[in-house]
Amino acid sequence: MINYMIPKGFLCCGKHVGIKKRKLDLGVVYSEKLCSAAAVFTKNKFCGIPIIVGKENIKDNKLQSIVVTSGVANVATGEEGLKNTYRILNKLSCELNIKSENILPSSTGIIGKQLPIDCIITGINGIKSSLSKYNWEEFNRAIMTTDKELKIKSCKIGDATVLGIAKGSGMIEPNMATMLAYFFTDASIKAVELKGILKRAVDKSFNMISIDHDTSTSDTAAILANGYVGNVNLEVFEKTFTDMCIDMAKDIVRDGEGVSKLIEATVMGCSSFESAKVIAKSIINSPLVKIAIYGSDPNWGRIAMAIGKSFEDDVDPLKIEIAFNSNVIYDKGKIYEENFDCIERYLRDNNECKIQANLNVGDFAATVWGSDFTEDYIRINSYYTKRK
């Protein structure tokens, strides 16, 4: 049963072409009309070949298709990797009868392996007949690696629909945007406006999450607007779209490798938003904080340590307040031991835990989302390449 709304004019599919042993590993989305488009990419300097090609293809802010391979990242693959990406685009452009430069490529998976290109080219044969407006779950499965759950969201904005598909559960600390997020809308939005909307939404959502403090080589977030239903109120569109991005970002954290709890850290009372964000990220990226949350341990000292090691000028221990779910445990040098038991129960009984820190030096705040560390995270990542 489909429990999401589908924008007009978009078709998709997910196929098994032989990159993985059995699972779906090739996803394609196609618009019946050329779209205005925008995309943001990883800032990792060791980026994947599809990122290099994608940056070129998005320069004119027009796309008509997205193609994603999963299982092999096509990173550190040199000239052969570049040729393979162009072979995929050229083959798909012939099958869909569109320009290859209007296709955005992505790959996710193991770094340092070449794509099994012959299998992929064979799998693209006749792919247009596999496209359907109902195949979004198959597309989502085709782009997944260690994900456990589908990540599909949709919303209505006037007459227009926005559909979002994402993957990502490890190597997650986007800095733009392994995290992939694609959005499709039948609204008519000019490219220059779409670029601003996407960047601002990503900055408030995907760039505010972290699972393991590693920025992937392949992160991509893109939006395509084909204009089927006409104009929308851009202010309403941006707010609704941003809220959807935040929900999807939190879903990525919840589905993170070995994650048992989502951590929401809010740092307020800072002299700037950037300072608040740096300190909040320092909290959720601390292995000791993550492990304490996993063990339901109200170890506020680890939070204090994480705040201090941010090296931000805003940090003054005699002004700071630290709380769990608004239960204060430290305030300007005073420790509230009487709150330990209720905080411990809160951490034990909830799979989403809120940490607040008020630096009391300004008016700016930032909220970020992270996860705990469990034994499963180590198990999953200690033999990742051996499973492939």
Curated annotation (Swiss-Prot):
It is found in: Cytoplasm. The active site is at T178 (nucleophile). Its main location: cytoplasm. InterPro entries: Arg_biosynth_ArgJ, ArgJ-like_dom_sf, ArgJ_beta_C. It catalyses: N(2)-acetyl-L-ornithine + L-glutamate = N-acetyl-L-glutamate + L-ornithine; L-glutamate + acetyl-CoA = N-acetyl-L-glutamate + CoA + H(+). Pfam families: ArgJ (PF01960). One of its GO terms (biological process) is L-arginine biosynthetic process. GO terms for cellular component: cytoplasm. Pathway: Amino-acid biosynthesis; L-arginine biosynthesis; L-ornithine and N-acetyl-L-glutamate from L-glutamate and N(2)-acetyl-L-ornithine (cyclic): step 1/1; Amino-acid biosynthesis; L-arginine biosynthesis; N(2)-acetyl-L-ornithine from L-glutamate: step 1/4. It comes from the Bacteria. Keywords: Acyltransferase, Amino-acid biosynthesis, Arginine biosynthesis, Autocatalytic cleavage, Cytoplasm, Multifunctional enzyme, Transferase. Substrate binds at T145, K167, T178, E257, N381. Its EC number is 2.3.1.35, 2.3.1.1. The keyword Cytoplasm applies. The record marks T108, G109 as: Involved in the stabilization of negative charge on the oxyanion by the formation of the oxyanion hole. GO terms for molecular function: glutamate N-acetyltransferase activity; L-glutamate N-acetyltransferase activity. The keyword Aminoacyl-tRNA synthetase does not apply. Belongs to the ArgJ family. PANTHER family: ARGININE BIOSYNTHESIS BIFUNCTIONAL PROTEIN ARGJ, ARGININE BIOSYNTHESIS BIFUNCTIONAL PROTEIN ARGJ, MITOCHONDRIAL. Heterotetramer of two alpha and two beta chains. This is Arginine biosynthesis bifunctional protein ArgJ 2.
